[in-house]
Swiss-Prot record:
First-listed, main subcellular location of the protein, grouped into a coarse class: secreted
Keywords: Antimicrobial, Disulfide bond, Fungicide, Plant defense, Secreted, Signal
Keyword Iron among record annotations: no
CC per GO annotation: extracellular region
Signal peptide bounds: 1-19
Protein name (Swiss-Prot/TrEMBL): Putative defensin-like protein 211
Disulfide bridge partners, by residue number: C55-C72, C58-C77, C62-C79
GO biological process, one term: defense response to fungus
Species assigned in the record: Arabidopsis thaliana (Mouse-ear cress)
Family: Belongs to the DEFL family.
Length: 86
């Protein structure tokens, strides 16, 4: 009986801390990593072509999360905080 009460108390504390962390992380800007698909021809692409491929994959990653692209510069992908909505 005592173990059950202790377990439930611990569960409530962990869930409340998790909700607080999630709420604070939603207010900050999120940066999503984009991993390009492995391609043996990547070495043959110019820097500009690789950047275009990266930004295309960045846009796809943002749209999968229903977020517009905020920026794609120097191989850093940033999605906007707001959702895409009509």
């Amino acid at each position: 009986m005592n173990t059950i009460v202790l377990f439930l108390t611990l569960l409530i504390l962990v869930s409340s801390c998790t909700s607080i962390v999630m709420k604070s992380s939603n207010s900050k800007e999120r940066t999503y990593p984009v991993t390009p698909a492995l391609n043996p021809l990547t070495g043959q692409h110019s820097l500009r072509q690789r950047q275009l491929i990266f930004c295309d994959e960045c846009a796809n990653a943002c749209f999968r999360r229903k977020k517009p692209v905020r920026s794609c510069q120097r191989f850093i992908c940033r999605c906007a905080i707001r959702d895409v909505g009509y």
